């Protein structure tokens, strides 16, 4: 929430900075003693398709900058976490934003696609997986601009001279923060063979001590995945790794229907 507040403050600061430019003329006789200028204008309706992992903060990132420069916004939040976007729209209305300037539409993917393909949409912003983002970009109306923020498969490369003790906490936190449901989470670690066993054992030791449970409990370090299907998917990945020769260095079990133990 604090990051969302900071994002709103930045958008407010930028309002007065969106200026045009004056261009000195006089390069020809007909333009002597003349000045040209450019003006920036709102481009029109913005469609925003958001993600589930930081629902309020991401909605703010997509909605507030557009409103700050004079563009109305329609946001389609992730169906798993729709209330954050709905509440944001209610807050904006309470703050005095005119009706219609910020709208939240909770719908399935097919209906969400209509927001992108509509010729009335001047700009669309998407946060989510690469395949879906590029697909929507290919279906947008001619002239519609886009901003795509996709997930990654962020690697870390560990050289033999690395400070192992200093990096282990960061690697574990980077991999398991928010149960790994972050676009910039550590997903792959390439370690020089001379220190591979040492690094692997230390990561496993640190990961095995992470507290799994209710995210509302201050002691919890790894909370639930967004739904049961994601827990099934993690379990399938772990089993696939074992089938292909991988060695499990930690526990590898489900905790109820919504959590999976940090596994190395």
Task: Name every feature range the model reports, one short phrase each.
Residues 96, 123, 130-264:
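ALDH superfamily catalytic-core signature
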Residues 2, 82, 235:
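Conserved catalytic core of two-component sensor histidine kinases
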Residues 5, 63, 85, 203, ...:
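Short amphipathic alpha-helical/adjacent loop interface patches that line ligand
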């Amino acid at each position: 929430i604090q990051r969302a507040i900071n994002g709103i403050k930045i958008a407010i600061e930028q309002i007065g900075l969106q200026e045009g430019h004056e261009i000195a003329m006089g390069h020809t006789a007909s333009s002597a003693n003349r000045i040209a200028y450019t003006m920036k204008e709102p481009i029109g309706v913005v469609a925003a398709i958001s993600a589930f992992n930081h629902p309020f903060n991401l909605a703010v990132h997509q909605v507030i900058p557009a409103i700050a420069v004079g563009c109305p916004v329609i946001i389609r939040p992730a169906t798993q976490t729709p209330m954050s976007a709905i509440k944001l729209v209610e807050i904006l209305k309470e703050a005095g934003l005119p009706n219609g300037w910020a709208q939240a539409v909770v719908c399935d993917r097919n209906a969400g696609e209509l927001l992108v393909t509509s010729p009335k949409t001047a700009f669309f912003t998407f946060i989510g997986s690469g395949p879906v983002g590029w697909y929507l970009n290919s279906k947008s109306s001619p002239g519609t601009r886009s901003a795509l923020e996709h997930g990654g498969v962020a690697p870390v490369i560990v050289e033999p001279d690395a400070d192992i003790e200093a990096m282990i906490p960061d690697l574990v936190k980077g991999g398991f923060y928010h149960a790994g449901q972050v676009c910039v989470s550590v997903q792959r670690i390439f370690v020089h063979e001379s220190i591979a066993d040492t690094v692997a054992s230390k990561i496993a030791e640190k990961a095995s001590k992470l507290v799994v449970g209710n995210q509302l409990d201050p002691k919890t370090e790894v909370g639930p995945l967004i739904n049961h299907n994601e827990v099934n998917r993690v379990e399938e990945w772990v089993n696939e790794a074992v089938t292909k020769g991988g060695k499990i260095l930690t526990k590898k079990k489900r905790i109820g229907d919504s959590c999976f133990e940090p596994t190395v």
